[in-house]
């Protein structure tokens, strides 16, 4: 098969291929970028595979960086771009269900493509826009099927993360998982316990943000892969409710929103403890926790000025979007209106600070000063006190007389 035209992302990288070929080696575009070109999807990273060994690649180009030379990868800096050029290779036995014990460089493209995960990721594309398809990936692409390259059991036993990648591809491409591939995913799902949680997080996060995330969650359920992820041992009913609760075409707008929705559906009591196990950042944990808090109090009451001040209008709107997707009442206008009424959005905007109270009104550092500052802040937020020095000092004087 031949593409009707070579997408601009490949055209920009074409001089890399031409230089490698001029030096007497083979070179092709490979991987997900070729698949995305065939599907008319946006192309992101353009990867190049070559029969040139790393040291040979480095001799061809003036500017290179060793970013994974032991695995055959050299970063080529050319024409204002950065391109990963990886030598054709085969891989030895996988020792930890994630990484091969060793790699061997080869001159054969087919041997290199044989180690790929799925047939739709095992294409190569030459400089003439001709697609090399050694494993019937084009047929799978037409049929929207996700099939492992070769024996599915071997692919997942080599690298258990491919199970999560498969679920993610089902969600992002809207593909069905081929029967034997699905069976191998299910029988090897227990190996996910061997995979670093950081890598599992990346794949699950991408699944949640995919346009067809519901398909990915349904496959996660069907394979029972969720049982081997940290703190995800909930009943199938809770996972099914997660899918059922949201409008069919709903897409999450951020990772934080997606994880908040997940934890809400699974009824986790301690979201921050859960997210800590998934090795997420403190800021990520705080944001997810806040979204969960907002969603829960919105089931009981409407938004107040204090809520807008504490959480910020953007986070409140993000939580409101989850309500809208669950066909619950929303009030974006009230959030915007209350935000417009706030005299301050941060306590540092208050014109009087603790130092001034100590200097002019004799306060000492301690609980009394803290209580007074919080009272000033709350009164300004509630609109009961103007944010000017005269009003604040009078407010404090009145407090001291009570």
UniProtKB/Swiss-Prot annotation:
The EC code for this enzyme is 2.7.7.72
GO annotation, biological process: RNA repair; tRNA 3'-terminal CCA addition
InterPro entries according to UniProt:
Bact_CCA-adding_enz_type3_sf (IPR050264), CCA-adding_enz_C (IPR032810), CCA-adding_enz_firmicutes (IPR023068), NT_sf (IPR043519), PolA_pol_head_dom (IPR002646), PolyA_RNA-bd (IPR032828)
Q: Specify the signal sequence span.
A: none
This entry's Gene Ontology molecular function terms read: ATP binding; CCA tRNA nucleotidyltransferase activity; magnesium ion binding; tRNA binding
Q: Which residues does the record give as ATP binding sites?
A: 32, 35, 116, 159, 162, 165, 168
Q: Which cofactors does this gene product need? A: Mg(2+)
Keyword Metal-binding listed? The answer is yes
Q: List the catalytic activities from the record.
A: a tRNA precursor + 2 CTP + ATP = a tRNA with a 3' CCA end + 3 diphosphate; a tRNA with a 3' CCA end + 2 CTP + ATP = a tRNA with a 3' CCACCA end + 3 diphosphate
UniProt: CTP binding residues: 32, 35, 116, 159, 162, 165, 168
Instruction: Tell me the domain of life.
Output: Bacteria
Q: Binding positions for Mg(2+)?
A: 45, 47
Its keywords, alphabetically, are: ATP-binding, Magnesium, Metal-binding, Nucleotide-binding, Nucleotidyltransferase, RNA repair, RNA-binding, Transferase, tRNA processing
Does the keyword Calcium feature in the UniProt annotation? no
Locate the transmembrane regions by residue number: none
Q: What else is known?
A: A single active site specifically recognizes both ATP and CTP and is responsible for their addition.
Quaternary structure, per UniProt, is: Homodimer.
Physiological role = Catalyzes the addition and repair of the essential 3'-terminal CCA sequence in tRNAs without using a nucleic acid template. Adds these three nucleotides in the order of C, C, and A to the tRNA nucleotide-73, using CTP and ATP as substrates and producing inorganic pyrophosphate. tRNA 3'-terminal CCA addition is required both for tRNA processing and repair. Also involved in tRNA surveillance by mediating tandem CCA addition to generate a CCACCA at the 3' terminus of unstable tRNAs. While stable tRNAs receive only 3'-terminal CCA, unstable tRNAs are marked with CCACCA and rapidly degraded.
Recorded family membership: Belongs to the tRNA nucleotidyltransferase/poly(A) polymerase family. Bacterial CCA-adding enzyme type 3 subfamily.
According to UniProt, the name of this protein is: CCA-adding enzyme
Q: Which organism is it from?
A: Streptococcus thermophilus (strain ATCC BAA-250 / LMG 18311)
């Amino acid at each position: 098969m031949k593409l009707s035209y070579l997408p601009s992302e490949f055209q920009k990288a074409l001089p890399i291929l031409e230089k490698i070929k001029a030096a007497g080696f083979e070179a092709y575009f490979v991987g997900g970028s070729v698949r995305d070109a065939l599907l008319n999807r946006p192309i992101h990273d353009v990867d190049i595979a070559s029969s040139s060994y790393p040291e040979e690649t480095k001799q061809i180009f003036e500017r290179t960086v060793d970013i994974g030379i032991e695995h055959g990868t050299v970063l080529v800096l050319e024409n204002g771009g950065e391109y990963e050029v990886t030598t054709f290779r085969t891989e030895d036995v996988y020792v930890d269900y994630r990484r091969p014990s060793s790699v061997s460089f080869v001159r054969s493209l087919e041997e290199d493509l044989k180690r790929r995960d799925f047939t739709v990721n095992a294409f190569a594309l030459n400089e003439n826009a001709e697609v090399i398809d050694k494993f019937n990936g084009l047929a799978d692409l037409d049929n929207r099927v996700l099939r492992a390259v070769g024996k599915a059991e071997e692919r997942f036993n080599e690298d258990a993360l491919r199970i999560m990648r498969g679920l993610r591809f089902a969600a992002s491409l809207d593909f069905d998982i081929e029967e034997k591939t699905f069976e191998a995913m299910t029988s090897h799902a227990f190996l996910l316990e061997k995979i670093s949680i950081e890598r599992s997080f990346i794949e699950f996060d991408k699944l949640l943000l995919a346009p067809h995330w519901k398909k990915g969650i349904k496959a996660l359920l069907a394979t029972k892969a969720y049982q081997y992820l940290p703190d995800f041992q909930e009943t199938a009913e809770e996972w099914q409710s997660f899918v059922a609760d949201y409008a069919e075409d709903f897409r999450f707008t951020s990772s934080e929103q997606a994880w908040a929705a997940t934890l809400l559906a699974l009824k986790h009591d301690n979201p921050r403890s859960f997210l800590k196990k998934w090795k997420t950042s403190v800021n990520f944990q705080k944001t997810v926790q806040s979204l969960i808090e907002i969603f829960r109090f919105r089931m009981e009451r409407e938004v107040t000025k204090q809520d807008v001040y504490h959480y910020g209008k953007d986070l409140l709107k993000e939580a409101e979007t989850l309500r809208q997707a669950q066909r619950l009442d929303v009030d974006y206008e009230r959030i915007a209106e209350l935000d417009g009424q706030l005299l301050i959005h941060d306590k540092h905007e208050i014109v009087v600070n603790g130092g001034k109270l100590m200097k002019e009104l004799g306060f000492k550092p301690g609980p009394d000063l803290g209580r007074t500052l919080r009272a000033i802040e709350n009164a300004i937020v509630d609109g009961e006190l103007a944010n000017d020095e005269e009003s604040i000092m009078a407010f404090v004087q009145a407090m001291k007389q009570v």
